[in-house]
A protein has these predicted regions:
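N-terminal secretory signal peptides
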Residues: 1-13, 21-32
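Extracytoplasmic "Venus flytrap"
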Residues: 53-72, 76, 80, 92-99, ...
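Segments of small-molecule ligand-sensing domains
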Residues: 311-315, 327-384
Length: 388
């Protein structure tokens, strides 16, 4: 195996990406049991339940993410229902499109939705969040959208996922502590708000933390079939590690290219259909959730039993989103008969008081709707996530 300035070029990823951080956001396996046009689920259905809607891509190129969120919400509604407060869920497909997401939102309002755990993607979440302050006012907590634009100026919109700046800052601080002598290439999707947002905050914190970035390479969705040109430039610049806040599909391409070029090879990356998992050996990820962590065993086993797949971080974040709604409902003293506006106002106040001991950590929220929790670093070893 050839070397780069005496070392292999190693990727560091986040939850949805290759090298370093979170967007998880994750979720590549196709999850069973989801209808492409949505459907009712949960422990109860009908008028005698508190109705939780969810929105995400259930068809199209990003369907795996939406299906993970849908199933995380569904399982959460089952697990956090009580006799006094049963929860029901309904999913609608937005194909990761903002206009379709707003249409899906209105469909869920017609169904009687009292709170929204969604949408899944950032663009769709920004579009729907702008509607949540209208009449009826609607409480929204997105499992996986990470842009600050989602919650900015919204008093009833919250996030489960780290914001983009937090992901980039935390990743740079961690890498500066653990890998201060490495030379980094920053590799990201310049056409994606999630990827470029994390890259910007990572770069700023890297400068402050004296982390050396020797090269910066970008791509867009229509060119995500081969990254050999970018990797060649990174090698020539003397890079020894890659920081890549990108989604799983381009991450799998990147790792194949890294391996092909004689270098050493994300959360969710092991579930990409047809992906050679040996390529991810030694991969470093920063993520608040691992299906291999013993503390998550009950959730993982229940998810596998119901859907036949291992849950990823999208599913875990969605499950934690329902958990947060359930805790906030108790804190606010709300029941199944709460109207959306009443629920939005009281749940939003309750969110600032609760602490959720969730799958993705101990979660609290600030008055901007942003979550506070700690990421954990994992290394892929023998096809499993091992805490670094």
């Amino acid at each position: 195996m050839s070397s780069l300035t005496g070392k292999s070029l190693n990727p560091v990823m986040n939850r949805r990406s290759v090298i370093a951080s979170a967007a998880g956001l994750g979720a590549m396996s196709i999850l069973a049991g989801c209808s492409s046009n949505g459907g009712d689920s949960g422990s109860a259905s009908g008028d005698a339940s508190f109705k939780i809607g969810t929105i995400g891509p259930l068809t199209g190129a990003n369907a795996s993410y939406g299906k993970s969120v849908t199933q995380g919400v569904e399982l959460g509604c089952k697990d956090f229902s009580t006799k006094e407060l049963p929860l029901a869920s309904k999913a609608e497909d937005d194909q990761a499109d903002g206009e379709k997401a707003v249409n899906a939102f209105n469909t869920l309002l017609d169904w009687g939705m009292q709170a929204l755990v969604g949408p899944t993607t950032t663009g769709a979440s920004v579009a729907v969040a702008a509607e949540c302050g209208n009449d009826p006012k609607t409480f929204m907590i997105t499992p996986s959208a990470s842009s600050e634009d989602v919650t900015d100026g919204k008093d009833c919109v919250f996030q489960v996922c780290f914001t983009d700046p937090n992901q980039g800052v935390n990743a740079a601080k961690f890498l500066a502590q653990k890998y201060a002598d490495e030379k980094f290439v920053l590799f990201y999707n310049s056409g994606d708000a999630y990827s470029s947002g994390i890259a910007d905050s990572f770069k700023a914190q890297a400068a402050e933390s004296k982390l050396e970035i020797v090269d910066e390479e970008t791509f867009k969705d229509d060119s995500a079939t081969s990254f050999t040109n970018q990797l060649t430039k990174a090698k020539q610049a003397g890079a020894t590690m890659i920081f890549a806040p990108i989604y799983y599909t381009p991450a799998s391409v990147l790792l194949k290219n890294v391996k092909m070029m004689g270098c050493d090879g994300m959360d969710g990356i092991l579930g990409v259909e047809g992906f050679d998992t040996s390529l991810a050996e030694g991969l470093l990820l920063m993520t608040p959730f691992s299906a291999d962590d013993e503390k998550n065993a009950d959730f993982v086993n229940a998810y596998k039993d119901k859907y036949g797949d291992t849950p990823d971080q999208f599913a875990a974040d969605a499950y934690d989103g329902v958990h947060a709604v359930a805790e906030a409902l108790k804190e606010a003293g709300l029941g199944v008969d709460a109207d959306p506006t009443e629920a939005a106002e009281k749940l939003s106040k309750a969110m600032l008081k609760i602490t959720v001991d969730g799958l993705t950590g101990k979660l609290t929220w600030n008055d901007k709707g942003q979550v506070q929790k700690e990421p954990t670093a994992y290394v892929i070893t023998d096809g499993k996530y091992v805490q670094a």
